[in-house]
Amino acid sequence: MNNLLSVQDAACYLHISSSTLYRWVHCKKIEYVKIGSRVLFTKESLEIFIQNNTITPN
């Protein structure tokens, strides 16, 4: 489970608040893993999210 990040750790990794991340989970804007009641994230899915939301200049 070392490659899974908690909401708090993932939010810190993305430089956003935990509440923003929970909102994205609720809206299914970001990929996550649910184990019981825990919401977790892989670093790989966070990297993909960052790549998919990167805006490059013209």
Q: What kind of region is each of these model predictions?
A:
Residues 33-39:
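Short Lys/Arg-enriched helix C-cap and helix-to-coil transition segments
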Residues 26-27, 51:
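Residue-level detection of the helix-turn-helix DNA-binding "recognition helix"
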Residues 1-20:
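Polyanion-binding surface elements
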Residues 28-29, 45:
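Conserved functional loop/turn residues at catalytic and ligand-binding sites
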Residues 46-58:
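A short, Lys/Arg-enriched interface patch at domain edges and termini
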